Regions:
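Acidic-glycine-rich active-site phosphate/pyrophosphate-binding loop
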Residues: 1-8, 106-124, 173-178
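Conserved beta-strand-centric core segments of catalytic alpha/beta enzyme folds
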Residues: 1-36, 138-209
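Condensing-enzyme catalytic core mediating Claisen C-C bond formation in acyl metabolism
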Residues: 5-85, 91-92, 209
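Beta-strand segments within the central parallel beta-sheet cores of soluble alpha/beta enzyme folds
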Residues: 43-51, 88-95, 121-129, 157-165, ...
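Glycine-rich, phosphate-binding/catalytic loops in enzymes
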Residues: 46-47, 109-111, 206
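Short glycine/threonine-rich loop-to-helix capping motif typified by GTGT followed
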Residues: 58-69, 97-115, 134-141, 173
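Stable alpha-helical structural segments in soluble proteins, enriched in small hydrophobic residues
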Residues: 75-83, 109, 113, 146-149
Length: 209
């Protein structure tokens, strides 16, 4: 266990992951039409290009804690289509990635949904490696993290996954281990594949006046 080393306890994508670590907090974003925000001179952090929500119906392996892979992939594809972008436009994936058995399946679902090879997968990260799993608040917090990254041109590291899960190893070049500047970052995909086989994915774009 990691009781004596709490900073190493949350281990998404790791071969030694032993389940999610509860966290807490909140994340709030104000959504506003672009015309309204411009008219009042608001600071615009990012644009929401599109999103998609669905449920796997507890079928094809889906359950209270496991996602239906077909529905996960349909959710990702739906968000990309609604955003009007191509898979190659995505520069960073902020995944659900919880340090459970589902992590390798999630990474493969991203690859399959985007119809890319392992080498072509965008950068991928887990905010839960930094703060744990805030349950109902996780998606909001991770949306804030996503917006900050696309606005400021960086990707935060995923901690504690130096020992990548064997099924994730082929995606090693995409896993962000250390925080780094990514000045060319313009589109980020944020997803939550939560309890009850419920899925959500949103596409954020860097705002350019």
């Amino acid at each position: 266990g990691k009781n004596d080393a709490p900073a190493q306890a949350s281990r998404p994508l790791s071969a030694s992951a032993a389940g999610f670590i509860p966290g807490s907090g909140s994340g709030v974003l104000m959504l506003e039409s672009l015309d309204s925000a411009r008219a009042r001179g608001a600071r615009i952090w990012a644009e929401v290009l599109g999103g998609f929500v669905n449920c796997g119906g507890h079928r094809q392996g889906g359950s209270m804690t496991a996602p239906n892979p077909t529905s996960v992939q349909r959710c990702i594809r739906g968000a990309v289509a609604m955003a009007g972008i191509l898979p190659r436009d995505i520069g960073l994936i902020n995944g659900h990635l919880t340090a459970t058995f589902a992590d390798p399946h999630e990474v493969e679902n991203w690859r399959a949904a985007l119809e890319l090879s392992a080498e072509q997968l965008p950068l991928i990260q887990s905010t839960k490696s930094l703060i744990g799993h805030a349950l109902g608040a996780a998606g909001g917090i991770e949306c804030v993290a996503s917006v900050l990254q696309v606005a400021r041109g960086f990707a935060h590291g995923s901690l504690n996954c130096e020992d990548l899960h064997p099924e994730v190893a082929r995606f090693a070049s995409s896993v962000v281990h250390q925080t780094r500047e990514v000045p060319e970052l313009s589109v980020i995909a944020k997803a939550s594949f939560g309890f009850g086989d419920v899925n959500g994915c949103v596409i954020f774009k860097k705002y350019s006046a």
